[in-house]
Amino acid sequence: MGSVSAGERGDRRDYNGVMTLTSVLPSLRRTIPDPLRPAKWPEYTHPTTDDVIIAGVSLSRLVELCETPCVHTADALVPGSHSKPALRADASVVVVTVEGVHAGDAGERVVLIDAELTRVVALWEETRLLGRVSTAAARVAVVLGGADGGTPSARGHACLPADLREGDLLAIPCRGAVCLHDVRLSA
């Protein structure tokens, strides 16, 4: 039995079923960032309205230096520990570029990204827009990785702004240490 998404329910809850100020009033995203779940992100992660900072590293700036896809890895947090770092665990964030947004065969919104995420444990429900502030309501989308002319793969579901467009950046947290060769499309 599948779960019902926020968009299918027609209410203002996010993908996780949580109602936040920014999901009720998306215009607030201009002044306050969407909340994130700290245990799903690396240690010392905090959001801004248009970026995510991890241990002092701006993911938007990382993209300027490295292009996409790019990866940032740091210590993971112990779930339920109020931000206590895990001694022997890592967490990563993969930053990708949206290569296209279109309607799928069943009418669902499909987002194509410039990375292959089949070899990583992506936490799709925490995916965030980087580089710009969107005041559009969030809707569930199917995210497909690896669309480099081959068959798209790494299907995930993420709650993303309705005005998502080609060229937008997405930050996707992942469990464990992710290497760039794990997510880069083969040439």
Regions found by a protein language model. Name each.
Residues 2-89, 160-170, 176-187:
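A charged N-terminal "starter" segment
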Residues 21, 57-58, 63, 83-187:
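Charged (often Lys/Glu-rich) extended helix/loop segments that serve as interaction or gating elements
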